[in-house]
């Protein structure tokens, strides 16, 4: 089987065989050999050879290839959505939106290069000052499993537009989606070596991250893995390291007239994608008193009716399975540990089948947990924290090392002003779900949530470096010489 894409051709991997599974059925979704260290070496060497030609190619010519990629994505939307659903458990309705987002990033990325990078000129006394942007060279892109098409392309598209070449290491849990995406890139007309795919598990990732011939590493994934990468590159300032990681995101419920709207946005924040979005709300702050009780009762009522099913079920469910049976068991275990520390389950999470990734949307009151662990539970596990004062809610919301997203649901504009001034997060929403974001705005956080903004627009900032020039078309002796010089 040809699992890897190196130097413009599909080739067999020489590492251990691994497989991905449909988390809703346990059927094998993809199987093949991983990339060995030698395979990674060939992929990086291929990207290095291709860099000179690709970076020298006219910018508009590079953009035409990327635009063809977007057009092909639109043509193959259903097939790609099925691949995403089969491997991640994500319902088809949601997988279709992921493919659409992949295509939409292209136009924004091209616009971003012109507006944020590109070339700018300013006249000066003896010539002109010019700001240009140059690609870094060979960049490694590490993709996550939760959006295996959309999120890696948030790095790949702007990297290619800027003139870099890429070695792509997808999540070992979604290799089939990666292959399908790279096939589209190949058909779009990318020259050999410009994009290389290395499939594999931990050893493949280590071989790529440790390679001395990469100029940048762009990563979307867990904070633990991103932190290890950051430590690994300590003392190597020549490497451009862009990290987009997780969050322990707060959603604060304030004074609202429309309880159903607040409940809807809370469910979208906590349970969309089965809670497997880095921007999902993990901690929901609910006021004490009658208003909070009404909100919580309605939240429990609607949440209890949410079903999870296979990706292609008819009718479509709100949630699919989480990525694996192991991930489901880990969530149930996290709930058990919280209960041991004093939490009170309101809707208890259970794993439907030990072989599958199905868990129910769950709600647990952690108000009485003395030392609430600052962890990202990556799934539909909503933690309720009751608060007496709005200041207290903000203080506790900020009690995290993460800083990705935060939200306030409130009719009070003054409360919003206070919230946005004092909350510590990169994405802060008002009367919208915490996971609502635009590709034309910065996407990313602060603290343990990362150090760059890998949306289509702001990714341009780290995909090229600025080069400043002072230029004159005519070489001439200046009219005024420095003291001590005689001509």
From Swiss-Prot:
Pathway: Amino-acid degradation; L-arginine degradation via AST pathway; L-glutamate and succinate from L-arginine: step 4/5
Example of a GO biological process term: arginine catabolic process to glutamate
Keywords assigned: Arginine metabolism, NAD, Oxidoreductase
This protein's record includes keyword NAD: yes
List of catalytic residues: 244, 278
Pfam families in the record: Aldedh (PF00171)
InterPro entries: Ald_DH/histidinol_DH, Ald_DH_C, Ald_DH_CS_CYS, Ald_DH_CS_GLU, Ald_DH_N, Aldehyde_DH_dom, SuccinylGlu_semiald_DH_AstD
Enzyme class: oxidoreductase
Source superkingdom: Bacteria
Reactions listed under catalytic activity: N-succinyl-L-glutamate 5-semialdehyde + NAD(+) + H2O = N-succinyl-L-glutamate + NADH + 2 H(+)
Amino-acid positions noted as binding NAD(+) in the UniProt annotation, renumbered to this chain: 221-226
Molecular function terms from GO: succinylglutamate-semialdehyde dehydrogenase activity
EC number: 1.2.1.71
Family that this chain belongs to: Belongs to the aldehyde dehydrogenase family. AstD subfamily.
PANTHER family reported for this sequence: ALDEHYDE DEHYDROGENASE-RELATED
Primary role: Catalyzes the NAD-dependent reduction of succinylglutamate semialdehyde into succinylglutamate.
NCBIfam families associated with the record: arg_catab_astD (TIGR03240), PRK09457.1 (NF006992)
Listed name of the protein: N-succinylglutamate 5-semialdehyde dehydrogenase
Native source species: Burkholderia vietnamiensis (strain G4 / LMG 22486) (Burkholderia cepacia (strain R1808))
Lineage: Bacteria, Pseudomonadati, Pseudomonadota, Betaproteobacteria, Burkholderiales
